[in-house]
């Protein structure tokens, strides 16, 4: 129970319940992450305490956005090693979480975690973001699309906003210093049917890190021309 108090403090700060069962799930997730990371590249963060702080607590802090407390369906686009989707699923067993990633090896890892943690509320999908968003069963089908992927907001918006229902939200987990990036992405967000709602700063317990939650309202349907074909989204970001 080495990290229980630290994680509970983080949960308390965003109004989320934490208990021993959730803690044990996070610890098993940590062990699987370290084990699989020796076979495939999942994370550069490999020390137990750093995983707890910079992965788990960072994702738990997403609940500072009330939207994550109310949503019934969430898709994590470009989920990688499962962040923030898996922590959201552990914290809220009543929300349906879809994890989407383009690399099959990562999907195999995620399936292992879902099975070992006995998570009944998680589905994994092997797909590129721009391909998945063109599928009828996924497009504009989620209360929230989220991503912690390392990409510019213009790019992330085109990857994520098409998945969001009208009146839902796209929420990006970003680092500090995002003012310029957001200014550059406002037109793109609007083109895709979104409108910037606000930015929520979060502190990560036990570190000097400050991160930001960028919250976008989906106010109208995304034009059928988006997302563009593979490659164009990153090569020629919307402006």
UniProtKB/Swiss-Prot annotation:
It is an enzyme of class 2 (transferase). Pfam families: GidB. S-adenosyl-L-methionine binds at residues 78, 83, 129-130, 148. Its EC number is 2.1.1.-. One of its GO terms (cellular component) is cytosol. Belongs to the methyltransferase superfamily. RNA methyltransferase RsmG family. This is Ribosomal RNA small subunit methyltransferase G.
């Amino acid at each position: 129970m080495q990290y229980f108090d630290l994680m509970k403090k983080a949960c308390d700060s965003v109004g989320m319940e934490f208990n021993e069962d959730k803690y044990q799930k996070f610890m098993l997730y940590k062990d699987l992450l370290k084990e699989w990371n020796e076979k495939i590249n999942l994370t550069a963060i490999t020390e137990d305490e750093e995983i707890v702080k910079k992965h788990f607590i960072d994702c738990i802090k997403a609940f500072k956005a009330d939207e994550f407390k109310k949503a019934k369906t969430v898709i994590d686009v470009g989920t990688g090693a499962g962040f923030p989707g898996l922590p959201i699923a552990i914290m809220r067993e009543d929300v349906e979480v879809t994890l989407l990633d383009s690399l099959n090896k990562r999907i195999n890892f995620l399936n292992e975690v879902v099975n070992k943690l006995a998570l009944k509320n998680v589905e994994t999908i092997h797909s590129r973001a721009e391909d998945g968003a063109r599928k009828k069963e996924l497009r504009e089908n989620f209360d929230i699309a989220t991503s912690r992927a390392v990409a510019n907001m213009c790019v992330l918006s085109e990857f994520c906003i098409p998945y969001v229902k009208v009146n839902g939200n796209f929420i990006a987990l970003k680092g500090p210093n995002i003012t310029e990036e957001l200014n550059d992405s406002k037109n793109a967000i609007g083109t895709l049917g979104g409108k910037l709602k606000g930015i929520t700063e979060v502190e990560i317990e036990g570190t000097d890190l400050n991160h930001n939650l960028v919250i976008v309202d989906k106010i109208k349907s995304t034009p059928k021309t988006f997302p563009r074909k593979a490659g164009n989204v990153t090569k020629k970001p919307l402006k």
